[in-house]
């Protein structure tokens, strides 16, 4: 059904399989009104549409259209043979006081051949807490009954709860137990219209905390591209948009970071096929009907382009940078960044161990990215001093260890970086070496760095450089032990590197490439991020050292023979996993009896491995038989 192909934290590029084809996520579903198709489905497919959403209430309430839909199917009405989602009409019920039979609407969507139907949920905008709580209970009750009526149609069970985060969490938790195919987050249209992005961020986060990670999340009614980077970074996969046509009727043009009225525009600031073929003045002088169509096409081009930009950022690993840059386009998005900052501990659970692109500073929120939080936390918890005395240095050119005299100091060398304290031995791991900051950082980053440094020095004796010896010769050994402790956990360095140790370096760069212990290859150090790739011998040593379930991915006994042969681990065969595992971590693959089977790199964290029914969980590097 849904499968992750690549990711940047909670943002997923995935494939979602329906009866009428695959949707590559993240994706936008344009809204089509079957009564008034200003743009045909075929035209929108050429722009990038993969799927559409239409309102089943509109079809249901028109007798002629209803009969045709029941006879020919909704795909025929829309003139599109790909994936079609239907909304139940809940928003119309809220806006116009319409009463809809909940189960009849689900059955109707099923009977007209919708690929993805939606429950009749209760929209809670201005309700007080007690009323919103009752409406959540009713939404869940309807969802539970609707699951029995859906047949082979995928069902979207919408998370409601108004502006109350705890009710959103409660609703999501109860709906998650139903194992629906899609989980929309509803009730955000009024918040979008009022630009209450902080409320939207909190609603998404509290809902995502309880929703099953194996299901795509649809942010209902959020069709303006200004919110796409943030929403996708928080785990939303699907969006729908009626804004493209609604705004066009009002002569408003959508751009990635704003909306402009046509009357206010003097110059074209867009290179889409519409805007590059006519001038702004020509657009203004068009007949109303043609102008609406042209602006609607422009609006869709801009919206699809933003989805493509976000996908590119996911692939490159710099989505948080895009989110931060977009936040400066509207003050309310900066308020949303405060909500995100408060949830960085939770976000870290889903964050990649490293990224393809460097960590680029873009402002005061950069230091609060999940990967920066992880760096700070692990250094505080996992770094082990090698000397009684420590020497502190100001930020310098990276990697810090290029300065040979630092390696010879008989002291713990600590650099005060914008990230906080960085031990010299960890200067090449991601994101330390792979980061760019201006020399003059913002005051919040400066204060955060100084606060972390004070905490780090609390149990250290900090002295001047002239007070320590300068004859240390074992920097490489200190480095590999420190990286192992940071990457795998405290004590990993001693467990991996004991006996006769040979450090193999690149002839061209002089950087560590492999570590051989007692004649056996234990680990390789990656040039891209400064972390280790585990070899079988290294896996054996860590398996013997760490108690179960540390670093483990536990697979079904039936899958064990395939893992030994070096086959990849698929999520459906995972029984359990270590809670500390993060996406793209090196892991130990074991069976139900904790027998060591191999080493690999995971794509998913524990929650995802246990929830997904499709896709790869671990890319096996070596099986025990591969030696």
Task: List where the protein language model places each region.
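Glycine-rich phosphate/ribose-binding loops and adjacent secondary-structure elements
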Residues: 137-140, 147-276
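Beta-strand/loop-dominated core regions that host nucleotide or nucleotide-derived cofactor-binding catalytic loops
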Residues: 487-502, 518-583, 587-627
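Polyanion-binding interface signature
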Residues: 376-429, 500-548
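Residue-level signal for inorganic ion chemistry
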Residues: 109, 175, 584
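Non-catalytic, usually N-terminal nucleic-acid engagement modules in DNA/RNA processing proteins
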Residues: 1-151, 359-384, 393-447
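Gly/Ser/Thr/Ala-enriched C-terminal appendages of enzymes
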Residues: 242-335, 448, 490
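N-terminal intrinsically disordered, low-complexity, charge/repeat-rich segments that act as generic
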Residues: 460-527
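Flexible, glycine-rich loop/tail regions that form catalytic "lids" or insertion modules at the edges
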Residues: 333, 337-373
């Amino acid at each position: 059904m849904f499968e992750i192909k690549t990711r940047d934290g909670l943002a997923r590029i995935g494939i979602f399989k329906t009866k009428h084809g695959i949707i590559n996520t993240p994706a936008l579903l344009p809204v089509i009104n079957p009564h008034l198709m200003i743009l045909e489905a075929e035209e929108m497919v050429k722009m990038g549409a993969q799927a559409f959403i239409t309102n089943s209430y509109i079809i249901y309430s028109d007798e002629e259209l209803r009969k045709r839909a029941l006879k020919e199917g909704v795909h025929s009405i829309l003139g599109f043979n790909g994936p079609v989602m239907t909304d139940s009409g809940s928003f119309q019920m809220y806006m116009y006081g319409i009463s809809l039979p909940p189960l009849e609407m689900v059955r109707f969507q099923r009977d007209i051949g919708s690929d993805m139907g939606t429950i009749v949920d209760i929209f809670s905008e201005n309700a007080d807490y007690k009323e919103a709580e009752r409406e959540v209970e009713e939404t869940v009750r309807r969802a539970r009954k609707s699951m029995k009526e859906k047949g082979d149609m995928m069902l979207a069970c919408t998370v409601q709860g108004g502006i109350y985060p705890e009710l959103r969490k409660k609703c999501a938790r109860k709906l998650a137990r139903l194992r629906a195919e899609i989980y929309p987050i509803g009730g955000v249209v009024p918040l979008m219209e009022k630009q209450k992005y902080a409320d939207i961020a909190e609603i998404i986060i509290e809902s995502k905390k309880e929703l099953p990670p194996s299901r795509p999340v649809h942010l209902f009614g959020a069709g303006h591209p200004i919110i796409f980077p943030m929403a996708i970074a928080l785990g939303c996969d699907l969006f729908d948009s009626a804004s493209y046509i609604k705004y066009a009727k009002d002569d408003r043009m959508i751009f990635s970071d704003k909306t402009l009225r046509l009357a206010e525009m003097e110059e074209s600031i867009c290179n889409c096929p519409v805007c590059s073929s006519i001038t702004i003045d020509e657009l203004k002088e068009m007949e109303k009907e043609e102008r609406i169509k042209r602006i609607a096409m422009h609006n869709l081009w801009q919206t699809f382009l933003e989805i493509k930009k976000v996908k590119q950022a996911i692939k490159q690993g710099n989505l948080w940078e895009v989110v931060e840059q977009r936040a400066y386009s509207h003050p309310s998005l900066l308020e949303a960044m405060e909500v995100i900052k408060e949830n960085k501990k939770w976000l870290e659970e889903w964050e990649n161990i490293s990224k393809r692109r460097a960590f680029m500073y873009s402002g005061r929120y950069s230091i609060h990215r999940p990967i920066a939080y992880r760096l700070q936390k692990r250094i505080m918890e996992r770094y082990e001093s090698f000397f009684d005395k420590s020497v502190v240095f100001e930020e310098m050119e990276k990697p810090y260890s290029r300065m040979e005299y630092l390696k010879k100091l008989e002291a713990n060398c600590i650099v005060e970086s914008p990230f906080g304290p960085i031990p010299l031995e960890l200067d090449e791991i991601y994101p330390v070496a792979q980061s760019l900051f201006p020399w003059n950082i913002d005051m919040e980053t400066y204060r955060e760095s100084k606060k972390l440094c004070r905490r780090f020095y609390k149990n250290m004796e900090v002295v001047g450089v002239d007070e320590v010896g300068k004859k240390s010769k074992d920097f490489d050994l200190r480095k590999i032990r420190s990286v192992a402790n940071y990457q795998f956990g405290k004590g990993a360095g001693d467990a991996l590197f004991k006996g006769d140790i040979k450090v193999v370096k690149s002839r061209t760069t002089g950087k560590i490439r492999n570590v051989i212990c007692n004649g056996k290859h234990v680990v390789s150090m990656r040039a891209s991020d400064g972390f280790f790739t585990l070899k079988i011998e290294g896996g054996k040593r860590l398996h013997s050292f760490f108690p179960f379930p540390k670093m483990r991915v536990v697979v079904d006994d039936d899958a064990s023979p395939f893992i030994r042969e070096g086959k990849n681990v698929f999520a459906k065969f995972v029984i359990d996993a270590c809670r500390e595992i993060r996406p793209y971590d090196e892991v130990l693959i074991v069976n139900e009896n904790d027998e060591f089977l191999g080493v690999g790199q995971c794509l998913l964290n524990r929650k995802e491995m246990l929830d997904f029914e499709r896709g790869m969980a671990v890319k096996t590097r070596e099986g025990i038989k591969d030696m």
